[in-house]
Structures are given as C-alpha cells and as structure tokens.
Amino acid sequence: MSDVFCPTPWLEMFIRPNGDVIPCCEMISFDTTCGNVNTHSFEEIMNHSVYQKIREELIAGKKTRACTNCWKREDQTGGTSLRTKRVSNEYIQDIGGEGLGAEVFTKQIVTDIKSMKIDFSNGCNLKCPMCNYNRSTAWRKDKLAFEKDFDFEQYEYHGLKVKVKDWDEIFKTIPLSFIDDNIQYILQMGEINISGGEPFFHPQFHHLLDKLVENNYKGNLTLITNLTLLEDDTLEKLEKLESRLSISIDGCLDLYEYVRSATTHGKYDWNHIWGKIQQVMEADIHISFSYTPQLYNMYNIIPWLEITSEFRQRQRKKQLLNEVLISPNYLRIANHPDKAEKDRLIQSLGFWDHVRGVKSIQQALAQPQPEDRWIQFCKFTNFLDKQRKTSIIKYVPQFEKYWITE
C-alpha cells in the first residue's frame, strides 16, 4: 500500500444539504460532485466517473488533486489529517470493512458503502465567529453586513466578500423522503455520521433517529453537535443505539459564550453546556470533544485541558482536541504577534504532550506567519464585534496590549 493511499473513496459518501454527493468531506473545495441523491440512485452515485478516477489514482500511488486538503493539513501539522486517521485497521474494522489492502477495495461491490456522512441542513442555532454562512443559517445577518459595509482592502477573507446570489440554494435541505426511500442502504452501513448545521435543529435527524431505533440499527451513529438543544427524549433514543457524540465546543469558562455565540448573545453560557455534558456522561454515551485550537482560544487551551483531565482518567483514548485550525488563515493560532507568548504556550503544553493533538498545536505555533495576518484578524473581529455588540477583549484581555483598533 502506497504512502498516499486512502480507503475513503471505496467506503464513504458525504451528502450535502442540496443533495450533492462527494466522496469525502475534505474534498468540498474541489469539483468532486458524484451525483445528487434527489435525482440519482446509490448505484449511479457510487459508479460515478469522479469516484472511479479518484480510486484509480490512489491505487496508482498518485496524490490525487481531490485530496489536496489532507496533503496541506499534513504539511501544516506534522503529518496528521483525516486521511492518516482513515489508514488504520482500527477504523476499517470499526465501520465494518474487510481490511486495508488496496486489493480488498478493487473487489468490493461499489454500493456496499460502510459510512455515510450527511448534513441534512445548514440550519443552526449558533453563529460561531470561526464559522460562516455555508455552515450556519444564523450567520446570514452578519454575512449581509460584511457584503454591505466591510472594507476588504487587500484581504480576501475567504468568501466573505463574495455576494450570495441565491440564499435559497444555501438554505436547501435534504427531504424526509430521502430517509424512507433509502432505508435499506442506510441500515446496512457500519457508521452514520451527521453534522450540519446542528443535527438537533433538524427534523430530518429526528425522523432518522426514530427509524434507526425502530429497526434496531446495529451500526455506529456519530453526531457532531454543539449539544445546546439536547432534550431528554432524544437522549433516551440515543441510549438505545451505539451513539457517539463529538461535542463542538472551542472554548470553556467565560470564553464559551463568545466562541459559541447564540443568535441572542449569551443565551448559552458555560454552565448550560457543562450541564449538558454531564447529562450525556451520566447516560454512558461515548463522547469526544471537537475543540479546535485557533487564535480565539489560544489562552483557553490550558484551562480546557485542566478541566477535561477527569475525562482522560475515565477513558484514556477520549479525544479532547480537534485538529488545529488552518482555514480561514487569519484565525490561525500562529498569527499571534508576540513570539514570546507563543513560546510560552509551547512550553506550557509540554506538560500535556501525552494528549493527542497537543504536539500539532506546538508545531503550528512554531510556524512563521505573515505579519499582516494579525491586522487581518483584528479587522475581522472588530467588525464582527460591532455587528454583534460584543468585545473580544472582554473575553480575552490578554489581547488588549497587542490590539489594533480601527
């Protein structure tokens, strides 16, 4: 097996809110659409020429362009990406695959999908500053304000400048009928992975959950959720399945309500989310945390590791950290203008180097970044704070001595 191989194009599909299917969520930036669940059958999608080309290139040992995001992340973080996580017998077995060798996949029936990732909708009750209008409907008001009043100058700001021509396209959703029409395929999958938007915000998710419970689904149900909308009856249903919750959090204590901002700022504070986490822990549902290291939470990482140390004691392999943020580039953790501060954090993280993800933070902090990235970060945050009537300095006072106001 070559060192560029990835099993994903044989095992997985990612369904976007408009129904388009791509082989992997990391391929979203490229022309890799393999059909649409509203107009194509599963067999047509999995036999699509894009799927076939990617498979052929990976078997030939080529770095297929579709996988650029993983190559880029491996360069940025010292070798860690979604691809490197997929190339493991543990993962293959977990989703019900037959093995890792390329010869296994050349013989596989193409419709025998083992993992489906689906975003039913971009609907979300939060408008996190590191998110965008493509992932949260709550971002619409801010996006329109950026289009109207923000001075972009020489900075691109990753799509904020581009005017949305069709909001109906952005807000499309997968119909409930998709679940009923394809339940025979869904039930045979080893893993169903749902994100969004926010899954608990979507009626399609609750319909699927009822169907899985009704049919005694035996695979893994994985949710990427902010957890704020979890209700008791939903938790009871999740307990009946092999459920796994990846909790998107990105900040603890006072910072939480800033980086996980509700449409009404402060609606969900740390006490609220901590209570939800404890509730899930008591239900004995497997949880991990999607805490993405970035500039906003640079001074929050150590407190987060301290708070969650008890989880490590209960379950040694529990994920506490996500991959380091690399996009948008103005939010990268290495953009902090003070090298001494970054070196101090690198040293402090040495105590936690046994935690998966810490070394990639240290490596990211050591990466040189253009000096104007800090200016770009301040400019973006100043505008967003004005729009939302918030203040980053209130939550991260350590920034004040470096801050650039408009």
What are these regions (language model features)?
Residues 1-40, 44-45, 119, 140-143, ...:
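Radical SAM enzyme [4Fe-4S]-AdoMet core and its adjacent flexible, acidic
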Residues 77-114, 124-126, 147:
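Recognition helices and adjacent regulatory flanks at domain boundaries
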Residues 204-210, 231-238, 300-304:
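Distinct, well-ordered alpha-helical segments
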